[in-house]
């Protein structure tokens, strides 16, 4: 049950941040840097001291055997995307696909029956990510959106083997692939 709360918070904040990026564009870089610094400070303070509301929220958001760094990694991943990707729509979709897809993959994957032990994931979670990402991207990018959704779902599916928190790199990878759509489509047509 805790994981469902955690993923719901992840989903809501991710969607809000994605739309904030779309509205405020690159102006979010400085506030995001400040938020990351404050988040890191609060994280270390909460490890030593109880801070009302902040400690409770962090405890609600962290997994039982993890220390709750996911939100900080997510903010850093968004910052990397904002700095390195010029196309704001690509950054928006990178964050949105990750927030929705990752949350639904976890929520649905928890109850999944078809487990792939090697990856520590379920087929149902993979499909939840792929379908949600496809529904988000297809109206704007057509079949290329489905290609991006498939690549994104696969990367999320194997993320435990990568051993780097997917909050850090997946929003950037999705934004990068969308941003380089013309080059990738040309390469696919060439092959």
From Swiss-Prot:
Identify the keywords attached in UniProt to this record, alphabetized.
Answer: Cell membrane, Membrane, Transmembrane, Transmembrane helix
Which GO cellular component does the record give, naming just one? plasma membrane
Give the record's membrane topology: Multi-pass membrane protein
Where in or outside the cell?
Cell membrane
> What is this protein's record name?
Uncharacterized protein MJ1137
Q: Sorted alphabetically, which InterPro entries does this protein's record hold? A: Dgk1-like (IPR037997)
Record field: transmembrane: 4-24, 26-46, 68-88, 90-110, 135-155, 168-188
Q: Name one GO molecular function term.
A: ATP-dependent diacylglycerol kinase activity
Instruction: Please give the PANTHER family that the UniProt record associates with this protein.
Output: CTP-DEPENDENT DIACYLGLYCEROL KINASE 1
């Amino acid at each position: 049950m805790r994981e469902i709360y955690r993923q719901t918070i992840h989903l809501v904040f991710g969607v809000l941040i994605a739309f904030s990026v779309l509205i405020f564009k690159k102006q979010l870089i400085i506030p995001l840097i400040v938020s990351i610094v404050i988040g890191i400070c609060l994280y270390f303070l909460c490890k030593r001291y109880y801070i009302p509301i902040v400690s409770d929220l962090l405890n609600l958001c962290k997994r039982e055997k993890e220390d709750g760094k996911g939100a900080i990694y997510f903010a850093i991943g968004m910052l990397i995307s904002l700095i390195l990707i010029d196309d704001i729509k690509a950054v928006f979709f990178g964050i949105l696909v990750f927030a929705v897809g990752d949350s639904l993959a976890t929520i649905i994957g928890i109850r999944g029956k078809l487990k792939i032990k090697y990856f520590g994931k379920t087929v149902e979670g993979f499909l939840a990510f792929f379908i949600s990402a496809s529904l988000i991207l297809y109206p704007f990018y057509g079949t290329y959106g489905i290609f991006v959704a498939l690549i994104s779902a696969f990367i999320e599916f194997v993320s435990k083997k990568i051993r780097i928190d997917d909050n850090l790199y997946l929003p950037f990878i999705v934004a990068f692939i969308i941003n380089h759509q013309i080059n990738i489509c040309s390469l696919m047509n060439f092959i």
